[in-house]
Amino acid sequence: WQSTATRMMGGEAEPTATPEDGDRRFKDASWSDNDVFDYIKQSYLLTSRWLQSTVADVEGLDDKSAGKVDFHTRRFVEALSPSNFVPTNPVVLKETAETGGQNLLNGLKNLLQDLDKNTGRLNIRMTDEDAFEIGKNVAVSPGKVVFRNDLMELIQFDPSTETVARRPLLIMPPWINKYYIFDLRKENSFIQWAVGQGHTVFVISWVNPDARLTEKTLDDYMLEGPLAALGAIEKATGEAKINAIGYCIGGTLLACTLAYMAARKDERIPSATFFTTMIDFEDAGELAVFIDEQQLSALEARMDKLGYLEGAEMASTFNMMRGNDLIWSFVINNYLLGKDPFPFDLLYWNSDATRMPATMHSFYLRKMYLENKLIEPGGITLDGVALDLRKIKVPCYLIST
């Protein structure tokens, strides 16, 4: 308050607290130029940092409990940001004055539109979903389905070059979202780039399961996913050796598949690439906050009723880890400013989440996240084969950015 008083009397004073680099909540000049809002901003930053440091200094907590306390304290602090409230956000106040409050009426309409009429769940729109259409301006690379079963369709994309690589390329996306993360727009499509390099690309497009697939296991995802794809690719191309890429949980499945194939002396995948893949779950980052026996049991009870985990529930978990960017920025834009979200292909894909079969997902969370069994030789058994990652001898490239 002393620095604010000095500024209000015409003096110069350095701010006591400033936002961290990358914090876009206070980017508008009003947060610094207006003495009142600068005071509100600095008071919030000082208080939130004090609260977080106080909680961090609590004694007697194990690392896991301390991580949970820190995580939820930060979510609490984010929710109380002055940028999230009409009276303390100068940008919203200006918009309200200029529009005569029309922004708040528009925001209420947006809020009602985002509320699920059946469940009451709030699904905050992150992008203009009407601006995108599968096959028109996202997932536009020309391909054909060459194989399908209960869990996936296999899509083939032919190379666009005169010289063609002999080995086909199999891409295994995660099944928590759709495959077209690899094929958003032509300018940022990995598939477009790969076929332009002479690769014959095959991509697994996972099914969005319902209760009929509740008993599907991780064994089934391996057998009916990559292993079924290998046979279909050989039938389509005549090539038995196939390079593979796994992304996120698709990469975890690729690691399981390679260990399974190594045990059976199956050499059809001579090289593997992993994009942002967890194999050792010892340090699962902030996701570990949601993994303990009590929370898993509650999750399993919810899944047992439906036969699957709703995609929106998984998406909400990931959004919480970046609350300012993936929750509160859209609350401000959609509900306080009354604006429609901006068209953004990546956020359209991010919102297009899929369900997960209860049996498979329970096994995955317990064996990977809770028990970290994948790194133990024989810790996980799929299709009767005890997996040992040490037996994987194929060249592997891993990228985690």
Regions found by a protein language model. Name each.
Residues 62-94, 235, 239, 257-361, ...:
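Alpha/beta-hydrolase-fold enzymes
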Residues 164-175:
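Short beta-strand element of the alpha/beta-hydrolase
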Residues 1-152, 164-165, 202, 309:
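Amphipathic, low-complexity, repeat-rich surface-exposed segments
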Residues 230-250:
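Alpha/beta-hydrolase fold nucleophile elbow
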Residues 244-246, 275, 399:
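Short beta-strand immediately N-terminal to the catalytic nucleophile in serine-hydrolase-like folds
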Residues 183-201:
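Short amphipathic alpha-helix adjacent to the substrate-entry channel of hydrolases
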Residues 392, 398-400:
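Short beta-strand/loop motif that positions the catalytic acidic residue
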Residues 213-237:
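Alpha/beta-hydrolase active-site loop
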